[in-house]
């Protein structure tokens, strides 16, 4: 799939992204951006600690790369408890989830990434565990089968998903706290890039960090990934110091433009503009024009372009906006 090959794709985690764990914030006071989420979580965590309770179950959703796993780690650290991590696709059988739940200590946090991908069988086991801190297990088969209940310690389930709409209503309704992560503002990303540069021992100007932040598509994961590539360029082509000019040269070399678009983003927009006169164009025709699967366009290429106002979905098909025409220096046609 094309997503795995794109430097500016937040949906894939590259091996080098794992190294970012060392520079991730560990407490709320270190957490940058998402001011509403931060202020609310500070209150919820303090209240739970004052009562001596486990934090209520928490659902975190939003685009990939915005720090859902980081926030789960922060919650566990702030509560002073253990964090157990797994993901929806890994929990194939009810017994897999039961094994994790029975090993939790009081108030521990169980983090399930991609929770929308839980199988129905596993999800059924989760309901009484979340609601009553009980595990219902069926022993035996057929007429001899019987159900036993196992009491669980109070715990916090944190579910993370990029597709909140794919969650079933019974599961979604059992989360007492729901937080949506938004794309980051450029000043917050600039701070994150500068902080990462310090951790990496890099000499980087404020303008250099700003240049990387502007092209990071509002996503910390992409910002840190671009920073590593800019570092490589600065060390090989210059003296290792990262200025705005060096950052711009490096990112231009990587085909990441001022809007954070790469070759595939530009290819799609130019196809709509040049081949279909700005649209509307049907998804199948557009897929054929750029030689990509329609699923790739829908899931990988389109979302950011639509969010930033460069592409529009209409009942008749995709249309390039005036902003897209202006981005390429092309005069849009006059509206009839």
UniProtKB/Swiss-Prot annotation:
Belongs to the RuvB family. GO terms for molecular function: ATP binding; ATP hydrolysis activity; four-way junction DNA binding; four-way junction helicase activity. Mg(2+) binds at residue 69. This is Holliday junction branch migration complex subunit RuvB. Gene3D superfamilies: 1.10.8.60, P-loop containing nucleotide triphosphate hydrolases, Winged helix-like DNA-binding domain superfamily/Winged helix DNA-binding domain. It comes from Shigella boydii serotype 18 (strain CDC 3083-94 / BS512). Keywords: ATP-binding, Cytoplasm, DNA damage, DNA recombination, DNA repair, DNA-binding, Hydrolase, Nucleotide-binding. The gene is ruvB. It is an enzyme of class 3 (hydrolase).
